[in-house]
């Protein structure tokens, strides 16, 4: 049988035309080297900075993703998010065309997730309806609103001397074991009933420490409005570096919808160390203390996203669904110093970015003054405008009393005879110092805090023995709760002290003092 060339070509043409092959055009590359979680990939010509790259799946079928950080002439330097032991030279890498995203929304509340938003608390999957990119541009100047609403931490020393406002960035800084995390956890616990969603980001901590924090929050009933993002010390440096941005995106979801959120980064020193590790492995040139040149930008772009946004921004973002509401994201970053050295690279960076700082000192902590806040060098640059009238009116003298007391106490060690005015100041300072002590996980409502501040300001404690001051305070609180509940309710609602309330409060403290022995 002789085949006609024309027939053959027609047959081939018809076959080609009828071919229904599905094609997936994706940029692919090849792994050149894998070291310490850093992968060099050749052949990805259209990759974006910060894009997610898809690597071969693990043995149990879990997808493995990486983050493209270095775009060089011949290769791409990527960091693996998760396990990388199964990746070898010659493996195929695909571009996804997506920037790293994490799930966001109210479905995450009450859960413990990793840096990628995957649940790690054993309570089943999270059915979040939305995801959002972890790297976002902070709201512009026009979109912002000035800080004028308080975040009540429930800690006397903070709410009276270094108040925090909604949308503020207030740094908590101190050596290890000075109670930094305790201050942050107290602030979360005190948000119960304040319409505030909290995000706690644990970076580079021991898994046992994170477990203890979650247990404390559960015991206080705070997990019902809290998301915990955990990147423990056992996780890769990349996951620790990414976790802060993931937590920020989860908090921004609420800010952009006219709600209030509080985020705690515990702590940014470890995030900077993780980023330094990633940068050095990527062969980026080291600078001061071996940190890369953009370590300031690492923290500034994160903390600038904490802001109070105006009603127009919220309305525009929600396409008119939410009107007349401002949103806020308040940040309490934590920095750990080495032997009180606040002039190191990362501490000075973060101090310059934030709107104030709370210094915690080892000496005060060891002396039993907890929270160990140094009133002299702790400041809040914008929180004063947000402080409630009630606390603002009563806390004016506290800071001065403390500062003068610390100064005089140093001189008094050398002086044998002191005049009455100095002795009076020392006595007042000792009582104020004693009164600002507070048990962990026992934040105070604003009304009881006002009663405490009023009693010391008006001299009710001047003849009470210093060792009995805390007993006086707890007894007074119990007395007010049982006999003057209406007054406390009035103070909570009005957040101001009018003449009638002041007279009633003075009478109540006077009545209690007579019975106090």
UniProtKB/Swiss-Prot annotation:
Residues annotated as binding ATP: 174-181
Keyword Cell membrane: yes
GO molecular function: ADP binding; ATP binding; proton-transporting ATP synthase activity, rotational mechanism
Chain coiled-coil ranges: none
Gene source species: Methylibium petroleiphilum (strain ATCC BAA-1232 / LMG 22953 / PM1)
NCBIfam families: atpA, PRK13343.1
GO terms under cellular component: plasma membrane; proton-transporting ATP synthase complex
EC number per UniProt: 7.1.2.2
Protein's name according to its UniProt entry: ATP synthase subunit alpha
Reaction equation(s) it catalyzes: ATP + H2O + 4 H(+)(in) = ADP + phosphate + 5 H(+)(out)
Gene behind the chain: atpA
InterPro entries named among the record's database cross-references: ATP_synth_asu-like_sf, ATP_synth_asu_C, ATP_synth_asu_C_sf, ATP_synth_F1_a_nt-bd_dom, ATP_synth_F1_asu, ATPase_a/bsu_AS, ATPase_F1/V1/A1_a/bsu_N, ATPase_F1/V1/A1_a/bsu_N_sf
Keywords (A to Z) from UniProt: ATP synthesis, ATP-binding, Cell inner membrane, Cell membrane, CF(1), Hydrogen ion transport, Ion transport, Membrane, Nucleotide-binding, Translocase, Transport
SUPFAM superfamilies xref list: C-terminal domain of alpha and beta subunits of F1 ATP synthase, N-terminal domain of alpha and beta subunits of F1 ATP synthase, P-loop containing nucleoside triphosphate hydrolases
Record-linked Pfam families: ATP-synt_ab (PF00006), ATP-synt_ab_C (PF00306), ATP-synt_ab_N (PF02874)
HAMAP family: ATP_synth_alpha_bact
Localization per record: Cell inner membrane
Family of this protein: Belongs to the ATPase alpha/beta chains family.
Function: Produces ATP from ADP in the presence of a proton gradient across the membrane. The alpha chain is a regulatory subunit.
Residues annotated as site: Required for activity: 378
Membrane topology, from the record: Peripheral membrane protein
Superkingdom per UniProt: Bacteria
